[in-house]
Amino acid sequence: MPICSVHPLAYHADPTGYFSLVRHAPGAVLLDSGRPEADRGRFDILSAWPLEILAPVADETGTAFLQRLRDSLARLGDAQLPEHSPLPFAGGLIGYLAYDFGRMLEPLPAQAVDDLHLPSARLGLYGWAMVSDHQARSSQLVFHPALADDERQRLIGLFEQSLPTADDASFHLSAPFATDIDAEHYRQAIERIHAYIQAGDCYQVNFAQRFRAQYSGDPWAAYQALRVACPTPFAGYLSLADNDAILSLSPERFVKVSQRQVETRPIKGTRPRGNTPAEDAAYAEELLASEKDRAENLMIVDLLRNDLGRTCRTGSVRVPQLFGLESYPNVHHLVSVVTGELPAAKDALDLLGGSFPGGSITGAPKIRSMQIIDELEPSRRSLYCGSLLYLDVRGEMDSSIAIRSLLAQDGQISCWGGGGIVADSQWEAEYQETFTKVRVLMQTLEAL
């Protein structure tokens, strides 16, 4: 088996300095664990100059596109990291699946307007990466054996130079964020969801609204401000064409595969952070004790057990954590963990095909909930509730749910906030929660 070469670099907890060296390059991508402010994530991965870019073509099925991804990894070729290396990436795919990639996997109506025209998936095939391991306090370049030696030497020279001490990038909104739907429209949508629940169509539907603003400047400057204001373990920045970008500050894992072991960490249940320690603790205790939030979370856990069971070895799906508390700068969340094991005949792409999009951001049952979302949300979700991910040539994968995420495109920046609607949901509280989840993002950018 060919072995990747690893070149040590000076360790930096903050990945933005290293990323600044490549951020203008084609296909520049950063998967960011939010250090040094966040403390849950272990690795940062960044790369650029992909060997190829893969995106769906007209009338291609989701299964066919996933097979093209599988074929691209095979073209790059099998490789292993040096013995005992814990690094997560040995060369392979990095990119995103938009929520609307789900349309390529399941039959859905086409009622919501596709006004952002973002491709439903875009992944680069990368022969190298700069990986920081915050547990070992190390940074290193990882080179797939197929990468040409002169390219390795060029990258070593690039990353061994002094990092820039300042970035002159700036970002400015021309007006505050505005929502696409007003409170009355939101109330009517929740009434419609309640009618579907009472009719037996569904138990829970994730309903979201979009916020938009015009901007000038560089989205990278916006991301740098956001990662300080809202550090999260599944953040990321993806450069797109024409200085457009994806900016993600997600707290939520979708699915991880490591040595054929599968983990998903659904979030369902939210409270704001308090202004005082006592108020903050009260919100956390209220969330942990909330029968409504626990019921919502359990519905999604059951859905994800089913989704993982479509691909994982029979009898391997477990729930090692139910209703755990995770706290972030803006919110407390209720988080559960579902695990499983891939059988020899299945891989991470089979798992994606059987479980995308995530159950925590659709509802239960999933397909009917997605049909209702398409009926009631006026525009397609685009990036929102899709996934940022890597998948390497060994089959190792990690992926996020693209919540708390923004799309900067054609001088307009969009973000979304949503929540799970169940039979006893009060529309006013749910409406306010959509603002709570993204307020820190919007206020941070409005202050620039």
Label the predicted regions.
Residues 1-448:
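Extended alpha-helical targeting/anchoring segments
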